[in-house]
Amino acid sequence: MLMATVSPARREPTPQAVRASPMPSAAAALVRRGGGGSGGTVLGKYELGRVLGQGSFAKVYQARHLETDECVAIKVLDKEKAVKGGMVHLVKREINVLRRVRHPNIVQLFEVMASKTKIYFVMEYVRGGELFSRVSKGRLREDTARRYFQQLVSAVDFCHARGVFHRDLKPENLLVDENGDLKVSDFGLAAGPDQFDPDGLLHTFCGTPAYVAPEVLRRRGYDGAKADIWSCGVILFALMAGYLPFHDHNIMVLYRKIYNGEFRCPRWFSKDFTRLITRLLDANPKTRITVPEIIESDWFKKGYKPVKFYIEDDKLYNLSDDVLNLEPADPVPPPLGLAPPVPPPPQGDDPDGSGSESDSSVVSCPATLSTGESQRVRGSLPRPASLNAFDIISFSKGFNLSGLFEERGNEIRFVSGEPMSDIVKKLEEIAKVKSFTVRRKDWRVSIEGTREGVKGPLTIGAEIFELTPSLVVVEVKRKAGDNEEYEDFCNMELKPGMQHLVHQMLPAPNGTPVSEKVERSSSLQAPLTLKLIGTEGSMS
């Protein structure tokens, strides 16, 4: 694993410029170095390209997914070296940490693969380079520095709410993508919720000297959140000044300055900024500013827009980029990306107009969800996976679909005989109770919370499948967020609100049991997918 550790031999940056630490970290190597060549393929899934960086235990390659052509970064770790170097527990910890922190301003871990000799971290490829390379050329404009700092605080706050503390925040570990958005990387030294001592503090002495907090130097235990906030303050000072607040070639003198909080603000710092940076670099962790106080500070609030996102099918989507605002309508319009309903075939009648057909390139929305207006068609859009009849039957014990309202872990499924439009409207009504707003894109209808939280969004996915012309299956899943919060939502809001829509068994006209009718159903219509997205507090 590529890591940066505290070492007395490390040369510190001078006040004239911010310099990179001599030992590249894992994430810093993602974009800094070039060179190398093709490395073949990885387990038949990725084609390796040039080497982006390397360290004692790993190399980082640019790579291409063979099926999707997506560009990724793959960190390749040598198993033998990791074992001999005692790094196995750190590798496992990094994997666990990265799976807990899915955020637009954090480099994503897509998957982890392994062979007999190698471990492969497939990660988001960030094209813009390190933030360090930008600040090393001189101080940034105030609005640019503020935007980076806002994104940094958003990511760090998200990590802290999930019990993750980075402990090595520095410009080398902050990447900037092609859109100018900041990405926090390299969680090799991060601490998880299982690493606290009985006193509730962290005791590992780690980090990079110029960015380490005074309480870490005291070696008496420290609050990981407070230590990260200090590092954020050092980074912000460097962005605005063009040099570090604490600097000296003598490591012990440097530590003394940090310990005592000895720094000076240049004359071009505004009063609001000086007030903020002074509180960020407060040597006393007990009086140091907290994240909520940072967000409420005058300097920080200018132009600040909280990040809102959701996770679907293990992929992260930023609502500000991917979701369109739509006013609620009655009847509910079809999701964008679907064709207008196809008329039923002449040889049969469709009782409720929901039995539309589709071909391989056009997906049709049931008529009960249509306003009659044409929608744009995207032939390249992948068709959602449909459940078959046997999947639906297996939802219920004893193959009985009567009054089905079944829970399986984080999933709830029930059968309804009501029109899909009524189900959608009821979901919208329930969402309003939680102050959610409805948004729609492609096959997704997103319901987004308006209250900002500290532990990320509660994400609930609801899919409606057409089972027969008169029956639908509604499947609700927790995609992300705190499980207890999800259960409260289901028990207090979802179940009571949807109970009257649950199907009651009625005798079939020809005496055939409903379960047998379902078995003979050839296929299910493409589902309408709804996302309930919140930004509730205290979620993990």
Swiss-Prot record:
Superkingdom: Eukaryota
Residues covered by region (Activation loop): 186-215
Enzyme class: transferase
Keyword Lipid metabolism among record annotations: no
Active site: 168
Biased composition (Low complexity): 353-364
Catalytic activity: L-seryl-[protein] + ATP = O-phospho-L-seryl-[protein] + ADP + H(+); L-threonyl-[protein] + ATP = O-phospho-L-threonyl-[protein] + ADP + H(+)
BP terms from Gene Ontology: signal transduction
Tissue-by-tissue expression: Expressed at low levels in leaf blades.
Enzyme nomenclature, EC number: 2.7.11.1
Domain NAF stretches: 370-406
Entry note about domains: The activation loop within the kinase domain is the target of phosphorylation/activation by upstream protein kinases. The PPI motif mediates the interaction with the ABI (abscisic acid-insensitive) phosphatases.
Record function comment: Involved in drought stress tolerance. CIPK serine-threonine protein kinases interact with CBL proteins. Binding of a CBL protein to the regulatory NAF domain of CIPK protein lead to the activation of the kinase in a calcium-dependent manner.
Family, similarity comment: Belongs to the protein kinase superfamily. CAMK Ser/Thr protein kinase family. SNF1 subfamily.
Protein name: CBL-interacting protein kinase 12
Organism: Oryza sativa subsp. japonica (Rice)
Gene (UniProt): CIPK12
